[in-house]
């Protein structure tokens, strides 16, 4: 008991003062949370505060952010090639930065990290893992992490699962993400194993193969009869829904209870159509990117994207001027990962290119104590400025994925034309009824539609939005791998499947 109390004090000191985390203390806290959940079945609010830190008023949080930013800026100016040169040119003392000085520091563009990744690695760091992004929306970038950082991320993920109860010892978690998404996969696998769940790293197989694995009955002692949790990109989840529909699957064929989605925009229509296939599953929608890890967000029941404030300074800046936006306005997320979470690849005011809308009113949701914005609107370079204003990928995707006439995931593109935007989309047919449905839903989402091109083949698209689900991987066939079953033609067949051997094509 004394050791656990000391570990809690050690964690509180790290969260409050920015001191390095103690891996031993984090592990003791995880053990304590596991014991509490086993005995009482749930973690009280005090347990959540232990992981997130105490709720701070805006003034106190702003003071802490400035102090942590100075600390990170000092290390960056002293120990990285990129920021040493930058602060020299700006003539700023990183130890004495004011908020006005912070605003003078230019955004760190993705292009700089992509072209000179080693210039951001701190000379005093001990990197042990070099992660690349998947490169879905551009050439991959490289980010280095230390063993301390990885242990910390896994520990906090595990504590998050234990506090929320969204993953436990009896669960079977199927991960359907690209095997190139090393950072997210390592953290997801490590945290799941730490809470005792069984992990199956499926990767991005052909959807029919993944459906077979999800429907497979298991008889592992202490585990549920079927896969109970799925981690997937929204676009790949859409492919699973579409394939499941074609193969005749029903909710009774699965045991899914929770679906974790991230890496792309998840729409209301996608989740509703996924529930039609898998049953009344609970969705956990998150946000995270390799460059700014562990600045990860979660979407609440009211549709707000919330962030734990101690891990990073998040600014929402105007698309044109770069100044801070006003409440209710749209801007780009500019993120500075802070100590004690980041010590290897240091990034100050990193331009994520992700667009959000600030909230016009204080939230009243379950996570109202955490900073929040709207759900992601999409990448800046994928948004379109037209005569009628900005049109964002979320508007188009929310409209299309709500329609059954548009196969999942929505295959589409859009661009500016006189008076608004032109939209192209793959649909099941090109009838007048389909066109009217698409036109109406786009207008309901506020898209100033002027031209609509309805196709029935992906190859006909001129400017398609990129999808992570297209980063497909291959498996050996005919060697004990999972076989695809059409539930309509063979409803009574009982099959045994082995886990597939993966070959990455990237």
Residues covered by each model-derived region:
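Conserved AMP-binding/adenylate-forming
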Residues: 257, 266-268, 272-362
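Short, well-ordered beta-strand segments
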Residues: 174-175, 334, 424
């Amino acid at each position: 008991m004394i050791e656990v109390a000391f570990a809690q004090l050690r964690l509180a000191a790290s969260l409050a003062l920015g001191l390095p985390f103690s891996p031993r203390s984090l592990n003791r806290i995880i053990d304590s949370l596991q014991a509490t959940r086993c005995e009482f079945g749930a973690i009280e609010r005090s347990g959540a505060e232990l992981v997130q830190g105490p709720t701070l008023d805006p003034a106190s949080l702003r003071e802490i952010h400035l102090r942590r930013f100075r600390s990170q800026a000092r290390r960056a100016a002293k120990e990285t090639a990129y920021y040493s040169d930058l602060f020299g040119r700006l003539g700023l003392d990183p130890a004495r930065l004011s908020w006005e000085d912070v605003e003078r520091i230019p955004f760190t563009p993705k292009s700089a990290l992509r072209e000179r990744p080693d210039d951001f690695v701190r000379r005093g760091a001990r990197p042990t893992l070099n992660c690349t992004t998947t490169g879905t929306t551009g050439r991959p970038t490289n980010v280095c992490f230390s063993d301390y950082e990885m242990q910390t991320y896994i520990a906090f993920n595990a504590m998050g699962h234990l506090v929320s109860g969204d993953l436990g010892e009896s669960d079977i978690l199927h991960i359907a993400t690209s095997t190139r998404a090393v950072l997210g996969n390592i953290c997801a696998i490590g945290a799941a194993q730490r809470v005792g769940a069984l992990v199956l790293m499926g990767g991005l197989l052909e959807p029919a193969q993944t459906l077979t694995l999800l429907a497979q009955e298991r008889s592992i002692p202490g585990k549920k009869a079927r896969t109970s949790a799925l981690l997937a990109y929204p676009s790949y989840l859409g492919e699973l829904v579409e394939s499941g529909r074609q193969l005749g699957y029903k909710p009774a064929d699965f045991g899914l209870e929770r679906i974790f989605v991230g890496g792309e925009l998840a729409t209301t229509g996608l989740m509703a159509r996924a529930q039609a296939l898998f049953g009344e599953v609970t969705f956990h929608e998150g946000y995270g990117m390799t460059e700014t890890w562990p600045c990860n967000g979660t979407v609440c029941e009211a549709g707000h994207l919330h962030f734990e404030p101690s891990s990073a300074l998040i600014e929402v800046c105007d698309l044109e001027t770069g100044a801070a936006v006003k409440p209710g306005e749209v801007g780009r997320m500019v993120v500075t990962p802070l100590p004690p979470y980041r010590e290897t690849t240091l990034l100050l005011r990193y331009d994520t290119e992700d667009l959000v809308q600030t909230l016009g009113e204080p939230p009243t949701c379950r996570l109202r104590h955490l900073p929040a914005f709207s759900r992601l609107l999409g990448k800046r370079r994928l948004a379109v400025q037209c005569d009628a204003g900005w049109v964002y990928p979320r508007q188009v995707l929310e409209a299309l994925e709500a329609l059954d006439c548009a196969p999942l995931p929505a295959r589409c593109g859009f661009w500016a034309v006189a008076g608004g935007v032109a939209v192209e989309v793959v649909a099941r047919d090109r009838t007048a009824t389909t066109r009217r449905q698409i036109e109406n839903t786009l207008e309901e989402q506020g898209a100033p539609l002027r031209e609509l091109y309805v196709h029935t083949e992906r190859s006909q698209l001129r400017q398609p939005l990129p999808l992570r689900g297209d980063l497909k991987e291959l498996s050996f066939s005919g060697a004990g791998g999972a076989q695809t079953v059409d539930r309509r033609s063979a409803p009574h067949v009982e099959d045994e499947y082995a886990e597939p051997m993966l070959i990455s094509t990237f």
